[in-house]
Amino acid sequence: MNTPAEIREILEKNQTFALFGHEYIDGDALWAILGLGRLLEKQWKTVSYFTPYEPSRVFSFLNWEKKVKTEFDYWKYDVLVFLDFNSYKRISAFTNGREEYFDPMQKVIIDHHKPELEPVNTAIYRDPEEISTCSLLYDLCSQWWPDLIDSEVATYLYMGLSTDSGNFRYDEGEQSVRVFQIAANLLKLWAQKKVIIDEIFRNKTYRSVQFMQLLLSRMQKVKFQLPFAEKETINLIYSFYEDTELEQYAVDHDEADYG
């Protein structure tokens, strides 16, 4: 793995960048590419943004379609940056059969997942202890370019942190302390928390409410025995849907996940 200083040197000495988010892109990956990309643009870099498939309608309030493309141009960029993933298979629509383009290129990976089949010619910085790639980016960029993190960038990074943590429900222990410290720092930089809460967690389409009604009608409660405690059981409530029902109700996977 490379040091933060080595990653910074690559980003600062080069001029043209292609930033990639993984297929079926989630909030953390989408806002990681937009956040880092904006910081590079502030340094007069030329940045292009790519992901294999259109992001969810949940994220449409960002007007991402003005920047993020779903077809890759295979131009000779100085650096390809993979954010929130670490193998070609996560952007297979771009990489399958095109390894002769990707392999020789200088690449950077910034990620919070455990390593998979990482490509050659790649500088890598990862921390699996981080709850999101956006929180990892904040840690790096607040050291590298603190004066460039404005309200727009802070909002992107806060959105990635918020969505990957389940709106701060998934973190525990020391990680929880760190997550809230980062969130507080981003709010001090004028991250637009209300926009995030309203647009992602509160606003619902009529179709998504109908879909939620379907899930509630299928809700079941069962007793579940914990594998590590033979005599201890918990009540588990679950529901389910089929992919064909997403089409029927005209909702996508992220709309279903965010309820």
How should these model regions be labeled?
Residues 45, 105, 146:
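Short glycine/serine/threonine/alanine-rich loop segments
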